[in-house]
Regions:
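Non-catalytic C-terminal accessory region of glycerolipid acyltransferases
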Residues: 1-10, 41, 100-205
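Glycine-rich helix-loop-beta junction characteristic of Rossmann-like nucleotide cofactor-binding loops
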Residues: 34-38
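Short, well-ordered alpha-helical scaffold segments within catalytic/effector domains
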Residues: 28, 52, 100-103
């Protein structure tokens, strides 16, 4: 696992603004449900995952700095694997050798009131919404912070489509918060999170 090196709040905020500008210019970009994001305090974004570029529209939608937790073996873009941790502080996780330092790093960010983004499916491979992993629920319950079910729509294969005369539609939808407490069951919260994500997605997803 590569240790994250988050840039300053200002630099990451500028990256968020730049992401919003880029998404707005290159795609028909829209955001729904932003009122569901807590105005302060830490929370966990739990989006579906269909393409390596999914963090870009999420960053654009939130703008404020986010700490991403992503599986290193699932990232297929070599430039992003090298650029993400250096520029923004993405935590790349080796799932075959998960280290205690990974958990400590995320805990540290939560204690600093950071927004955390974890893709519960853990992969972009396969069709449709896949089974959720337990990481989102684990960190939410451990810290008693809300989960924000999130839908990312329209990013699959988007890099190959950019540059054509037609601007593709890309949308980010934030669902209602799932509030957690220390007594909650991890599997129940995981199932509820995936159920709420599914509600936000198109029927033909």
């Amino acid at each position: 696992m590569r240790e994250p090196h988050p840039r300053s709040w200002l630099i990451r905020y500028i990256i968020g603004v730049f992401s919003l500008l880029l998404c707005s210019v290159l795609t028909k970009f829209s955001v729904e449900g932003k009122k569901n994001l807590p105005p302060s305090g830490p929370y966990i974004l739990a989006p579906n995952h269909i393409d390596d570029v999914d963090p870009a529209p999420i960053t654009a939608a939130v703008v404020k700095p986010i700490t991403y937790l992503m599986a290193e073996d699932q990232i297929e873009l070599p430039w992003y694997k090298a650029w993400g941790p250096w520029s923004y502080g993405v935590t790349l996780v080796n799932r075959s050798n998960l280290q205690i330092s990974t958990i400590k790093n995320i805990q540290k960010q939560i204690q600093k009131n950071e927004r955390i983004c974890i893709f519960p499916e853990g992969t972009v491979k396969g069709e449709g919404l896949k089974e959720g992993k337990r990481g989102v629920a684990y960190f939410a319950i451990k810290n008693e912070i809300p989960i924000i079910p999130t839908a990312v729509i329209g990013t699959k294969g988007i890099l190959e489509k950019i540059g054509s005369l037609k601007r593709e539609s890309v949308k980010v939808i934030f669902g209602s918060p799932i509030f957690t407490s220390s007594g909650d069951n991890i599997d129940d919260i995981t199932a509820l999170t995936m159920k709420e994500i599914k509600k936000l997605l198109p029927e033909d997803y």
